[in-house]
Amino acid sequence: MKGTPSFGKRNKKNHIRCRRCGRNAYNPTKKYCASCGFGRSKRLRRYSWQNKKPVTGKRLK
């Protein structure tokens, strides 16, 4: 089921506040932060697709 009654069962916290980045993205069961990667790696989790790239080489009419 996926309707309104099923949403009443969603009441437990999957993420808590992260020690490193402070965002509410640390998963205590998997023991890693979905935002900064704390618990998985020593380096900060960041990807090139997170930021929009400036438009270059586009022809203007």
UniProtKB/Swiss-Prot annotation:
Sites where the protein binds Zn(2+): C18, C21, C33, C36
Domain of life from the UniProt record: Archaea
GO molecular function: rRNA binding; structural constituent of ribosome; zinc ion binding
Gene Ontology cellular-component annotations: cytosolic large ribosomal subunit
Gene Ontology biological process: translation
C4-type Zn finger ranges: 18-36
Record's cofactor remark: Binds 1 zinc ion per subunit.
Pfam families reported for this sequence: Ribosomal_L37e
Keywords associated with the record: Metal-binding, Ribonucleoprotein, Ribosomal protein, RNA-binding, rRNA-binding, Zinc, Zinc-finger
Co-factor requirement: Zn(2+)
Function field: Binds to the 23S rRNA.
UniProt record similarity statement: Belongs to the eukaryotic ribosomal protein eL37 family.
Matches recorded under HAMAP family: Ribosomal_eL37
Name under which the protein is recorded: Large ribosomal subunit protein eL37
Species of the source: Methanosphaera stadtmanae (strain ATCC 43021 / DSM 3091 / JCM 11832 / MCB-3)
GN (gene name): rpl37e
